[in-house]
């Protein structure tokens, strides 16, 4: 009886820890929208949201109240059940990456020996939510946006995977903990700079972040695959995108910037600081670059990123053999 009770307490502790981490990630994803709006206003020399609360700090609460009172409309011409299911799938998949990220040596929800492969597998699953949303909406703009998203995601998934093979070969492991510990004295961004460039660009494409937001380009497709969504369903897609940005940034810190390693501050503080700096860089790129044509996006991937990723893998293999 004592053993079963101890197991129950252990399971309860794991559940509460996991719930707290996921809740914090969701809140960070939501607040990232506010931070992005304020930073874009700063870059563009204008005022951002500054009316609700001190300097607009309660703008997220105002947006939440507004969204809750919006009509939860389902188009009569759509496939009702798939239409409702798609945003929930997008939200769940965006959260599935978080458990394998090692924030500190002891703060990891799910220790996976093949964490890199798990990340690649989950990031490829995002196409299903987009496909279901575009198809079930029964709208030509939504379907075109979904097709664009699928082609872009599957293409850049190839470059993303190849950019990580150099790190896997260098550290000799798919385990994220081992990869971080391998960077104790030298971060991977130094020997794997080409891989970092490919990973960063591919990560932006997988998150559909500007300038890779072709699936939802307003000038061409109005809103892309979520054109028919409103209220909380649209919010799930919206928050999922920001959670994906945080996930990609966290993996970038884990793989290239030494994870939790850093002087003076506790490990988790260093991890948060590094992740936040990369997220800020995502916002800076959105404020700086125009949106290219869709065919240019695909051309850059297959004509430039693929050779760079293969060159990085070849150089890494030569370094290991020498």
From Swiss-Prot:
It is a multi-pass membrane protein. It catalyses: a quinone + NADH + 5 H(+)(in) = a quinol + NAD(+) + 4 H(+)(out). GO terms for molecular function: NADH dehydrogenase activity; oxidoreductase activity, acting on NAD(P)H, quinone or similar compound as acceptor; quinone binding. One of its GO terms (biological process) is aerobic respiration. GO terms for cellular component: plasma membrane. It is found in: Cell inner membrane. Its main location: membrane. Pfam families: NADHdh. Its EC number is 7.1.1.-. The chain crosses the membrane at residues 14-34, 81-101, 114-134, 149-169, 186-206, 237-257, 265-285, 302-322. It is an enzyme of class 7 (translocase). Keywords: Cell inner membrane, Cell membrane, Membrane, NAD, Quinone, Translocase, Transmembrane, Transmembrane helix, Ubiquinone. It comes from the Bacteria. NDH-1 is composed of 13 different subunits. Subunits NuoA, H, J, K, L, M, N constitute the membrane sector of the complex. Belongs to the complex I subunit 1 family. NDH-1 shuttles electrons from NADH, via FMN and iron-sulfur (Fe-S) centers, to quinones in the respiratory chain. The immediate electron acceptor for the enzyme in this species is believed to be ubiquinone. Couples the redox reaction to proton translocation (for every two electrons transferred, four hydrogen ions are translocated across the cytoplasmic membrane), and thus conserves the redox energy in a proton gradient. This subunit may bind ubiquinone. NCBIfam families: PRK06076.1-1, PRK06076.1-2. This is NADH-quinone oxidoreductase subunit H. It comes from Blochmanniella floridana.
